Amino acid sequence: MITTKEIIIASLNEALEKLEIKKPITLTEPKSYGDYSTNLALTLQKELGKPAIEIAKEIVNAIDLKKHKEIVKVEVANPGFINFWVSNSVLSDLVNSINSLEDHYGDMSKEGKGAVNIEFVSANPTGFLHIGHARNAAIGATLCNVLEKAGHRVVREYYVNDYGNQMNNLAASVFSRYQQIFNKDFPMPDDAYKGHDMTIFADAFFKKYGDKYRNVAYTEEVKKLFRDFGREIALENIKIDLGRFGVWFDLYTSETQQYEKDRVWPVIRRLKSTYEKDGATWLNTTKGGNDDKDRVIIKGNGESTYMCADIAYHEQKFVELHDPEKGKIIDIWGADHSGYVERIKFSFEDLGWRRDQIEILLFQLLRVVKNGKEIKMSKRLGTSLTLRELLDLVGKDAVRYFLIERSYNSKIDFDINKVQKSDETNPLFLIKYAHARCYQLLEKAQIKNPIASNLENDFAQKLTNELKEYPNLIDTMAKTYKVNLLPPYLLKLAGAFNSFYSNVRISGDPNEQSYLALVKATKIVLANAMKLMDLDIPNKM
């Protein structure tokens, strides 16, 4: 569906072509003076050497209003703005179209869209998820929904980092906590995980095995048993917490199985930019000038570094999309992994793929604040605040909404006091209340399929203009990965609806059916956008 904005931009481009001018066009939505406005003439005055007001008049005279009947009026305003008004029929048609499309409003064509693998969260299976993982999950899950809405086939993947020393630490931690069931003085290793989650895991081990492994020697066989058990119960708890958070995955891929299935070495052997030095195998990551030094991928003793499995895994993800031309893989990592970005991109390119087919988004840290003070420690775990504790404190929707309210590359403070409020100071409350009010209005009216025919009221037009921006929002987010644009859009839409509701008589008005159609369309778009964040959608509040 061609939007009104696209029609206006097309009319301006045609006018510029007549005047033999080339210039990008930006439209805004003014609070007054029309439905759309552009400062195009102001940006051209230096280039053309004449006043903006004169340029604006020339552009307006070149616009073919007979061709673009959706535009009912164009005016020039000082010092050189061009303002557009669109016909009432365009707005009514849009509202009726939204009500016809329902959940599919904003869907973009799948034609020409590549498949996308998004790997996110991917926390080590060594304990409960914490607040940093929560931000990763909120960003990743929302981006997956947005890209699907934009027409992409999306694969959600969790990489289980279950290979390496952190798993040995997990095994030793659970083993020690298990022994402490029988002997409270049993020592914990210095590098053990000391959170309460290890006690929970040890209790689960005791429930399954009883005292069978009491006072046993910590042999390789015993270590493997505790490592495997710890991995499984940690992953089980991770999945439980993600489920509560409204996050799910198509694939859980084990790092250990990358080696067991011999997926690593065939890929490593294909790297073009490796060399031998000091008995080790190095990857020439400085080759492109983006890394500060070359990296060892195989140590002198033949042991692989963590890079080997990661290099192979990234190619595996891409190949399994079965879309070598348009496919793309996206990783969402914490900002503390920034030094690893170029190494992975270089190795991906070194294997023969295009660099633009891998994207790595780095999200910044967050703090949880209550009563103006940072919550640094968990009351139960003695570690970072866990996702399950955060969900218990404020609920899924508040966490999902406020963790994507800011750009992923911005640090944020998650204010417990703010998100717990049920009043107009809480944007999530306002958004949900707007949806519930729409639902109640429609229930009371009992008109199943209202048809819009007259939306000349200023408040109705402003609200309709917000609705028509939704497809553009989907397109922008899909291209930029800026899912933080969703919350302010929802808040702006809710605000436009509340202004409409407060200033327009609906029941008994001659335009009642048109207004109810607009209410229905607003309800659809509010719900549609909230679903992208996996928020619960209330009909009553």
Swiss-Prot record:
Monomer. PROSITE patterns: AA_TRNA_LIGASE_I. GO terms for cellular component: cytoplasm. Its main location: cytoplasm. GO terms for biological process: arginyl-tRNA aminoacylation. InterPro entries: aa-tRNA-synth_I_CS, Arg-tRNA-ligase, Arg-tRNA-synth_N, Arg-tRNA-synth_N_sf, ArgRS_core, DALR_anticod-bd, Rossmann-like_a/b/a_fold, tRNAsynth_Ia_anticodon-bd. Keywords: Aminoacyl-tRNA synthetase, ATP-binding, Cytoplasm, Ligase, Nucleotide-binding, Protein biosynthesis. The keyword Cytoplasm applies. Pfam families: Arg_tRNA_synt_N, DALR_1, tRNA-synt_1d. It comes from Metamycoplasma arthritidis (strain 158L3-1) (Mycoplasma arthritidis). It is found in: Cytoplasm. It comes from the Bacteria. CDD domains: ArgRS_core. Its EC number is 6.1.1.19. The keyword Ligase applies. It catalyses: tRNA(Arg) + L-arginine + ATP = L-arginyl-tRNA(Arg) + AMP + diphosphate. This is Arginine--tRNA ligase. A motif ('HIGH' region) lies at residues 123-133. It is an enzyme of class 6 (ligase). GO terms for molecular function: arginine-tRNA ligase activity; ATP binding. The gene is argS. Belongs to the class-I aminoacyl-tRNA synthetase family.
